[in-house]
Regions:
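Short alpha-helical "packing" element that flanks the helix-turn-helix/winged-helix DNA-binding module
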Residues: 100, 114-115
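Helix-turn-helix DNA-binding module
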Residues: 105, 109, 113, 121-141, ...
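Sigma70-family region 2
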Residues: 34-50, 67-69, 153
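Short amphipathic alpha-helical boundary/capping segments
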Residues: 23, 99-108
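Short, small-hydrophobic-rich alpha-helical interface motif
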Residues: 17, 21, 28-40, 53-56, ...
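A short, charge-rich alpha-helical start-of-domain segment used by transcription regulators
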Residues: 1-29, 40, 44, 112
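C-terminal edge and immediately downstream basic/flexible tail or linker adjoining helix-turn-helix-like DNA-binding
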Residues: 5, 130-131, 147-164
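Arg/Lys-rich amphipathic alpha helix in sigma70-family domain 2
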Residues: 48, 58-77, 93
Length: 164
């Protein structure tokens, strides 16, 4: 199959194939692209090209849907098994683990990464800077801002001055 013939086939059928695949999976464009790649790699052209494309797209979309369900199931199971950031405490005056975890999760990702790396990982700001690709001063500022946000949300005592 020549490039012009393939381009015409893509132009004529790709939109309908994407719509067709969308009923089974959340990545219909990927499935359609894979179907066209399979077509290009064939040694012999299928007798009924358009029905062949629909069958390949259908099978690919169903496979993608199954893979997504499996992935979601395993990711949910892994999240359920993951250790919480905070351990529940028997001290009624202490922080509630769920509230503290939620407050930490609400921080921007780059700030949360720095707070966790410094508080729980024991990394210095220089080490964190090397890890995240920022300067130590930027990491320090984000850490201080993260602690201030946590302090405000939790009404908890946090170290006022982070240690370098």
């Amino acid at each position: 199959m020549g490039p012009d013939e393939l381009a015409e086939l893509v132009d004529r059928h790709s939109a309908a194939l994407v719509l067709y695949a969308r009923q089974w999976c959340g990545c219909p464009e990927d499935v359609v692209q894979t179907a066209f790649l399979k077509l290009v790699r064939l040694r012999a052209r299928p007798d009924n090209l358009v029905p062949w494309l629909y069958r390949v797209v259908r099978n690919g979309a169903i496979d993608a849907s199954r893979a997504a369900r499996r992935r979601q199931k395993y990711e949910a199971a892994a999240a359920d098994r993951a250790d919480p950031w905070f351990s529940p405490s028997d001290d009624p005056t202490g922080l509630d683990a769920r509230t503290a975890t939620a407050a930490l999760a609400d921080l921007p990702a780059e700030t949360r990464e720095i707070v966790v790396a410094h508080l729980w990982g024991g990394l210095t700001f220089e080490q964190i800077a090397q890890t995240v690709g920022s300067s130590a001063a930027t990491c320090y500022r984000r850490y201080a801002a993260g602690l201030a946000t946590l302090r405000q949300k939790l009404g908890a005592e946090c170290p006022a001055t982070p240690t370098r």
